[in-house]
A protein has these predicted regions:
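Generic structural signal for well-ordered alpha-helices
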Residues: 28-32, 63-70, 94-95, 121, ...
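Active-site gating/metal-coordination segments in enzymes
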Residues: 41-151
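Short, acidic/polar
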Residues: 25-34, 86-97, 179
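Mid-to-C-terminal alpha-helical segments outside catalytic/metal-binding sites
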Residues: 1-42, 223-227, 238-287
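Active-site environment of divalent metal-dependent phosphoester hydrolases
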Residues: 2, 50-53, 85-89, 112, ...
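Catalytic pocket-lining loop regions of alpha/beta-barrel enzymes
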Residues: 103-104, 117-229, 257
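A generic "structured core" feature
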Residues: 1, 93, 97, 160-163, ...
């Protein structure tokens, strides 16, 4: 979630290149309208720092926007903050956000140009583990130029999960396209979750197949889809498009019926995220 003043040009260009269904329109009103249209009860709204060396004023503006947008909607919108790990104020800022409004942290290693397993991030992870709050990571590749993939490869998350087993880790985009690697992470670590936003193929004829391949790999290796969460990456990918992709997958049982049940896929769409939110009190806050 971002104000129009803080949307960088490269994200505007990416949204325009995707055509219908992709937008930079943001804010609580548009998100709640989408949720109502899709039958979604609650959503996470994240602050996004899109550059490696932002000025303090920009970081404050990005977080303040999300804080103000989710205010008054705590039953439906949970705000995740963002920090600049290169700033000497990062840990203090993080504690302040968690103490006053944020339910979690968003870290985008590709845009912030820092490997997710960097020692510079460990003081931040220590705070998140102490609070028991989730970190939502960008994981896997990124289709947005000029950002680079190397900071968020799937294998980098193993060390974090080993060193911070009490910190809930949500791997945004499910380490796209490293399905076997993310399946291995979910097999090994109980605190790791895979989120399915933008797991949508570009070939319309096989659009749902990547999601099917991901879910089959996780079921075969981790034994369950319970740690697979619904997410959309709205407004760049709409909530409706993500729901429709799951519906397409359900309509193609040949892709999954030897391994999965329809109920397991429906749980990814309808119930797993709610169970995660309840377990971590995302929408019951005293802030």
């Amino acid at each position: 979630m971002w104000s129009q003043e803080t949307v960088p040009d490269f994200i505007r260009t990416y949204a325009a290149s995707r055509g219908a269904g992709s937008s930079v329109e943001s804010g609580a009103d548009s998100l709640l309208r989408s949720m109502d249209a899709c039958g979604i009860d609650a959503s996470v709204a994240v602050a996004l720092i899109p550059e490696p060396n932002p000025k303090d004023d920009l970081v404050s503006e990005i977080n303040d926007y999300v804080r103000m947008q989710v205010a008054g909607h705590s039953d439906r919108l949970a705000g995740f903050c963002a920090v600049n790990p290169r700033s000497p104020k990062a840990v203090d800022d993080l504690r302040r956000h968690l103490d006053t409004w944020a339910q979690g942290l968003k870290f985008h290693g590709a845009m912030q140009e820092m490997s997710v397993d960097s020692p510079s991030l460990y003081p931040i992870y220590e705070v998140m583990a102490a609070y028991g709050r989730p970190v939502l990571f960008h994981s896997g590749d990124i289709g947005v130029l000029p950002t680079k993939n190397r900071y968020t490869r799937a294998e980098l998350f193993d060390a974090i999960a080993c060193d911070f087993p009490s910190m809930p880790m949500i791997l945004g985009h499910a380490c796209r396209i490293e399905w076997s690697a993310v399946a291995g992470l979910l097999r090994k670590h109980r605190n790791v979750y895979a989120e399915i936003s933008s797991v949508i193929g570009r070939d319309q004829a096989t659009q749902a197949r990547p999601l099917g391949n991901l879910l089959v790999a996780i079921k075969e290796w981790a034994g369950s889809l319970e740690n697979v969460l619904f997410g959309s990456d709205a407004p760049l990918y709409s909530q409706a498009d993500t729901q429709q992709n799951i519906d397409r997958l359900l309509d193609e049982p040949s892709l999954w019926e030897s391994v999965l049940s329809a109920d397991e896929i429906l749980a990814v769409r309808d119930t797993n995220s709610g169970r995660f939110a309840t377990a971590h009190n995302l929408f019951t806050t005293s802030h």
